[in-house]
A protein has these predicted regions:
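Cullin-RING E3 adaptor/co-adaptor recruitment helices
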Residues: 2-31, 37-42, 68, 80, ...
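Ankyrin-repeat inter-repeat connecting loop/turn
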Residues: 72-76, 94, 127, 159, ...
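Intrinsically disordered, low-complexity Ser/Thr- and acidic-rich flexible linkers and loops
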Residues: 80-100, 243-260, 322-330
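Ankyrin repeat start-site detector
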Residues: 45, 100, 131-133, 164-165, ...
Length: 452
């Protein structure tokens, strides 16, 4: 053997040492060791046999590769899940899969390999190591691997440590199977009101935004603040009311989840009229998303129906500016609820735009027109409705455009006078009137699919 060289151990054939920089400067999330207690830098592993065994969860092979005297405090290079734009030459950009740093512990936690995780921890893997910005506990929570979460917490993993995006493990309990992970985190000391570093979101904000009813219930029972504010001034109730319908088929289920969340939050003491920095309130957001049942719930709590946001929009404006997917959620019910609670009517000059926008929802047009004593449309308004829509709703649009040239019926005019007289107390006074149910429904703008 040449002088000055030593024989390499089996590990050193495959492991290259990283630069001898303190761990905190290399990885960012590790705390600096105190002076006089240096910590060795993790070893960079390029052994494909080891990596394959980790990704497949081959416990027997890993027991061979990690004998009792070895260490599992290693760093692996893995390819990013998504390509990123990068420039290696001036002016030339390409999509490349960047290399990301991880550890055997992260791989086992992200794939739910519980026994592998136990083996690595016995081989001195550090539970809070985060070379890529996340700890193994973050990865286990993302995957909903409850057993792995428990093993890591018992091993001393920090339940409140932030990742590279400033999110704590509890913020990442979002998908299926993560409710049990959240319960474990809370049992081991996770802060129920811990905020993410940039957005200042609490776990309750995340649960409300994603429509996770069971998780929101758990967090509230463990003391989560129902009126916590994020960096934009949003409360969990605002986040819940902004739940979007992804498709017409999902409309009913989305509104049901949103309603359940709002009931939970209001029962826990959430402010039903809390506004964000742009003065948007839960009612504005529920109307924009077309959640009729949520709108009625908020109105029953006494929220201000005519409050304006920073742009001067009321809840009725928001309802009429909603996305096309709101058609599947019966926007006419939102508009009717607002008008029956004293919402200021649409400016007559804007009615042609409303007709053009909502012509495929004739009941929305009907309930709006029934709040005026006369028809407020120009004769050329018929051209705003596509011929196909006119044909599909021939009876309604025939009655609508006939009234452009003639007065409304005496019955309708009487309704307008009574509603105007009771304007300030309309929702409370109408049900108390000694009138037949059918007439009460008429006064409350019941749908008839025709105008007269």
């Amino acid at each position: 053997m040449p002088r000055g060289r030593k024989s390499l151990s089996p590990w050193e054939h495959h492991l290259g040492c990283l630069p001898s920089t303190p761990a905190c400067r290399v990885w960012g999330l590790q705390s600096c060791p105190t002076q006089g207690t240096p910590q060795p830098s993790p070893l960079l592993c390029r052994d494909m046999a080891l990596q394959n065994a980790l990704y497949t969860g081959d416990l027997a092979r890993l027991q061979e590769l990690f004998p009792p005297s070895s260490t599992a405090d290693l760093v692996l290079e893995s390819q990013a899940a998504e390509p990123r734009w990068s420039s290696h030459q001036r002016g030339l950009w390409s999509l490349t899969y960047e290399e990301e740093l991880t550890t055997p512990l992260h791989v086992a936690a992200s794939r739910g390999h519980t026994e592998v995780l136990r083996l690595l921890l016995r081989r001195r893997a550090r539970p809070d190591s985060a070379p890529g910005g996340r700890t193994a506990l973050h990865e286990a929570c993302v995957g909903g691997h409850t057993a792995c979460v428990h093993v890591l917490l018992v091993a001393g993993a920090d339940p409140n440590i932030p990742d590279q995006d400033g999110k704590r493990p509890l913020h990442l309990c979002q998908g299926p199977g993560t409710l049990e992970c959240a319960e474990l985190l809370l049992r081991f000391g996770a802060s129920v009101n811990g905020q993410s570093e940039e957005e200042k979101e609490t776990p309750l904000h995340v649960a409300a935004r994603l429509g996770h009813v069971e998780l929101a219930d758990l967090l509230l029972r463990r003391g989560a603040c129902p009126d916590a504010r994020d960096s934009e001034g949003w409360t969990p109730l605002l986040a819940a009311c902004d739940t979007r319908c992804q498709s017409p088929a999902d409309a009913e289920a989305t509104t049901t989840r949103c309603l359940q969340l709002c009931r939970l939050l209001l029962k826990a003491g959430a402010d039903a009229d809390a506004a964000d920095r742009d003065k948007r309130r839960p009612l504005h957001l529920a109307c924009r998303r077309g959640h009729a049942a949520v709108v009625e719930l908020l109105l029953s709590c006494g929220v201000s129906v005519n409050a304006m946001d920073y742009g001067g929009h009321t809840a009725l404006h928001c309802a009429l500016q909603g996305p096309a997917t709101a058609l599947a959620q019966s926007p006419e019910n939102v508009v009717r609820a607002l008008l029956n609670h004293g919402a200021v009517r649409v400016w007559p000059g804007a009615l042609p735009k409303v007709l053009e926008r909502w012509c495929t929802s004739p009941r929305t047009i009907e309930v709006l027109m029934n709040t005026y004593s006369g028809m407020r449309l120009p004769e050329e308004a018929m051209g705003l409705v596509p011929p196909e829509t006119l044909q599909n709703h021939q009876r309604f649009y025939s009655s609508l455009f006939a009234l452009v040239r003639q007065p409304r019926s005496l019955q309708h005019l009487s309704r307008c006078v009574l509603r105007s007289h009771l304007a300030s107390c309309l929702p409370h006074a109408l049900p108390l009137l000694p009138l037949p149910p059918r007439l009460l429904r008429y006064l409350q703008l019941d749908f008839e699919d025709v105008l007269y």
